[in-house]
A protein has these predicted regions:
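Charged catalytic and DNA/RNA-contacting regions of genome-maintenance
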Residues: 1-251, 255
Length: 256
């Protein structure tokens, strides 16, 4: 279990699907959650011993069936695969996380709903207003806005993002304004700073200015957009060339 524990420690807020032979196994609290969501058998490994731990798994060829169920239930999932042929391995088989899937960042056809956007939303709350950025990773559609809480709430209700990214300092403020019925991920406060956001926007779009996106006079929207790009990198979604711009909403309606 040392290899498992080492990998799990790097992804503590995910359900880790750990490839063992022809199965993906889950352990401990992950196994309890997976068994409940997937309606699979929950057993114990090392029953009665000091190393006793909950266990639940499914055949590897059923990943496309079970992964969508986990994600749609609001869970983040880390898929840990065998990185070498077990028959050729000298000692312990090398394993590593090959994919991270969150409720708001998916590209799997089995998870995506036809003709429906699948947004992750970043919310930057301040006493003077709220910045918002929304990204559909499957299409590259990237949008931003800033304004009072009422307008931001209208956009959220219209576009129904699957996951919120929040500054951990202001999670309570956001929940009070917009509710808490959407899966949330909290990020460190330094992610939500203008200079850091501008670095990410410049890196993503190869530009030294925000003028082409209308963000030069929208600092709250800029910060929210930067947090989304940071999150993509944080969970190792590095294929972002299809995200080619960011549309700033300036109208009281996201569809005007």
């Amino acid at each position: 279990m040392k290899q498992y524990n080492r990998i799990k420690a790097k992804h503590p807020d995910t359900v880790l699907l750990f490839r063992v032979g022809d199965f993906y196994e889950t352990f401990g609290s992950d196994a309890i959650a997976a068994a409940k969501v997937l309606d699979i058998v929950l057993t114990k490994r090392g029953n009665g011993s000091a190393s006793e731990i909950e266990l639940a798994g499914f055949p590897h060829h059923s990943l496309d069936t079970y992964l969508p169920k986990l994600v749609k239930s609001g869970l983040k999932v880390a898929v840990c695969d065998q990185l070498e042929d077990p028959k050729q391995a000298k000692g312990l088989v090398k394993r590593g996380v090959t994919e991270l899937v969150t409720p708001g960042l998916v590209t799997h056809d089995h998870v995506l709903e036809s003709k429906v956007n699948h947004f992750v939303a970043s919310l930057h709350w301040t006493p003077k207003g709220v910045g918002l950025a929304l990204l559909d990773l499957s299409t590259g559609e990237f949008q931003a806005a800033e304004g009072d809480a009422r307008w931001i709430d209208r956009i959220l209700r219209s576009l129904e993002p699957k996951e919120w990214l929040l500054d951990r300092r202001h999670e309570g403020d956001v929940r009070a304004l917009f509710g808490d019925d959407v899966p949330r991920t909290t990020l460190e406060d330094w992610v939500f700073t203008k200079a850091y956001a501008e670095e990410w926007i410049a890196k993503q779009f190869g530009t030294g200015t925000l003028k082409g996106f209308g963000l030069e006079d929208a600092p709250l929207a800029t910060i929210a957009a930067g947090a989304v790009l940071h999150y993509l990198d944080f969970i190792h979604h590095r294929e972002t060339t299809h995200i080619q711009g960011c549309l700033l909403y300036t109208s009281p309606s996201p569809r005007d």
